[in-house]
């Protein structure tokens, strides 16, 4: 009896449309999804189920506060971003040129840094209240009324002026892309500037504004430093309380799942809005709206409306921190600051390189696959960017701690040598969290760049005897270098600014710039937090300048 021919692994993979690159893409997908799957598993099968207790006590309050904060900041950012985008896109006035990119500068400052600066400026012992007491002869806080600084409205205020550039960026592009035809018709019917904005410009830009507002709300849910400093109890602060104070990982995972449900809803809203954005340029003839010159009082009003968000979101926080830094120059040589700076540069650089490398490999592997399965998995990996850092912290620490302990126990039994915790006891866990959190940035940049390369170039390289790796190195990468470089910068900047995941995953006595700022500000030592904050702002400005350059 003749035996059937032996099927080799490569032949089996080819049968299903897979190859080595495709398998690497699947491995990367699995690594990105591990934290999310861990959170879901731990929430469904907790060691100690405190869900009924959470449901009857703190969860409703956490949820109400989170939704209220999310909606308030989303609406505030939508108003600020839309008004400034309309003025920049449709009018010419003194200062409009530099305000066009200056309106992006608040993105350089993490919201928690802006919160620390605002409190320092406006608190009872701050310069504003001190000046008021001196001016009017007031002696104590009972002699006058002043808004409570560490409060829910203050958190909304800070987050709004830190995050509005997301709306501004998308709305400005939408207003610019609108055809002049509808605007000309409205003018011929005698409609004024406000009527044209309200009846034509705003409805056409609504999908872009909704997409920007959804991103703002996702960032609001992710925020920890601001709400923690203002004592606003949200779902994110609840994760820290339940896990670190109560020691219940299952309860923290259940709260994390609630956050994920909110995030999935927001992502769906953002995706739906982006799909509707395609109606902007359906006309075969397209001419942009010509800008109107504003002079006199109208020009001053337009300048003021556009300059105010820059002053609140960037100038004031930077000035407060700069004043502290200049008055405490010795803090710049503080060993703790230098160590935190080196830690930040190391983990952010490693994470950026790994993330972008993995993004390129995954996109290339998916493109080489003849099966549709890997292509369907590609959008799933972007969930890490939507998931808050606190959620990823829960999903990463638990499996890594389990692996660390098993590995250490096994090596101890075999060799009698204690290797310690090689993942959770070092910065490896932080780097992994950064890679998962910002993988979507690298993947999106690689996918867009690779999509612009003609398949004929790759086919020509293969016909000349180049293998898949050589084709990637000699054809794709040189043509993708600009996008890859931008992705490296954006991932690096986001890693420097990331706070929640770093707080949960850092080893003992390990600080990055973000955690050092949070630590010192929590102790009311803003003078010690100022140099680290300014380092973060300088790095963030690189990303803001890149966005300004790529969105001219």
PLM features: residue spans?
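Membrane-topology segments of multi-pass transport proteins
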Residues: 1-20, 51-53, 134-139, 247, ...
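Feature of multi-pass inner-membrane transport and sensor proteins
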Residues: 2-7, 132, 179-180, 195, ...
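Short helix-to-coil transition segments within interhelical loops
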Residues: 55, 91, 175-205, 232, ...
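Glycine-rich helix-loop "coupling/hinge" segments at transmembrane-helix boundaries
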Residues: 221-246, 497-526
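Short, charged juxtamembrane terminal tails flanking transmembrane helices
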Residues: 3, 549-552
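Membrane-interface interhelical loops and short amphipathic "cap" helices
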Residues: 48-62, 228-230, 236-250, 325-337, ...
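Membrane-water interface segments at the C-terminal ends of transmembrane alpha-helices
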Residues: 16-47, 57-176, 204-224, 252-271, ...
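Internal metal/ion-chelating core segments
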Residues: 188-194, 198-281, 286
């Amino acid at each position: 009896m003749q035996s059937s021919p032996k099927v080799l692994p490569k032949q089996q993979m080819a049968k299903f449309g897979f190859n080595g690159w495709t398998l690497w893409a699947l491995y990367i997908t699995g690594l990105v999804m591990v934290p999310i799957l861990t959170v879901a598993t731990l929430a469904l099968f907790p060691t100690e189920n405190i869900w009924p207790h959470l449901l009857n006590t703190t969860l409703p309050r956490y949820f109400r506060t989170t939704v209220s904060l999310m909606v308030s900041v989303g609406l505030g950012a939508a108003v600020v971003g839309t008004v400034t985008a309309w003025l920049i896109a449709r009018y010419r006035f003194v200062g409009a040129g530099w305000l066009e990119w200056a309106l992006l500068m608040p993105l350089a400052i993490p919201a928690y840094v802006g919160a620390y600066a605002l409190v320092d400026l406006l608190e009872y012992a701050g310069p504003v209240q001190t000046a008021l007491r001196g001016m009017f002869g007031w002696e104590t806080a009972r002699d006058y009324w002043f808004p409570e600084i560490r409060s829910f409205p203050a958190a909304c205020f800070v987050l709004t002026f830190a995050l509005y550039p997301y709306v501004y960026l998308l709305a400005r592009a939408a207003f610019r892309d609108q055809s002049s035809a509808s605007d000309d018709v409205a003018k011929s019917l005698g409609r004024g500037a406000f009527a044209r904005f309200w009846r034509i410009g705003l409805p056409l830009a609504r999908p872009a504004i909704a997409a920007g507002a959804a991103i703002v709300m996702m960032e609001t849910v992710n925020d920890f430093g601001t709400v923690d400093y203002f004592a606003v109890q949200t779902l994110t602060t609840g994760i820290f309380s339940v896990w670190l104070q109560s020691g219940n990982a299952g309860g923290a995972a259940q709260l994390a799942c609630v956050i994920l449900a909110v995030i999935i809803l927001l992502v769906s809203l953002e995706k739906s809005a982006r799909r509707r954005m395609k109606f902007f340029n359906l006309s075969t003839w397209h001419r942009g709206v010509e800008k109107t010159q504003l002079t006199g009082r109208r020009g001053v009003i337009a300048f003021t409306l556009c300059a105010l968000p820059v002053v609140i979101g960037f100038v004031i926080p930077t000035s407060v921190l700069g004043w502290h830094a200049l008055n405490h120059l010795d803090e710049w040589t503080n060993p703790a600051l230098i160590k935190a700076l080196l830690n930040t540069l190391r983990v952010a650089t490693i994470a950026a390189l790994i993330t972008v490398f993995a993004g390129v490999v995954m996109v290339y592997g998916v493109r080489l696959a003849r099966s549709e399965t890997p292509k369907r998995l590609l959008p799933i990996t972007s969930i890490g960017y939507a998931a808050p850092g606190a959620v990823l912290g829960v999903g990463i620490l638990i499996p890594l701690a389990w692996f660390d302990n098993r590995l250490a126990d096994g090596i101890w039994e075999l060799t009698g040598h204690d290797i310690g915790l090689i993942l959770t006891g070092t910065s490896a866990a932080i780097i992994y969290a950064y890679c998962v959190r910002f993988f979507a940035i690298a993947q999106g940049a690689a996918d867009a760049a690779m999509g612009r390369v003609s398949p004929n170039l790759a086919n020509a390289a293969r016909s000349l005897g180049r293998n898949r790796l050589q084709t990637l190195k000699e054809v794709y990468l040189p043509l993708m270098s600009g996008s890859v470089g931008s992705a490296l910068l954006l991932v690096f900047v986001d890693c420097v600014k990331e706070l929640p995941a770093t707080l949960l995953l850092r080893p003992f006595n390990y600080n990055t710039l973000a955690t050092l700022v949070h630590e010192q500000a929590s102790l009311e030592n803003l003078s010690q937090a100022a140099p680290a904050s300014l380092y973060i702002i300088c790095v963030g400005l690189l990303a803001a300048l890149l966005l300004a350059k790529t969105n001219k």
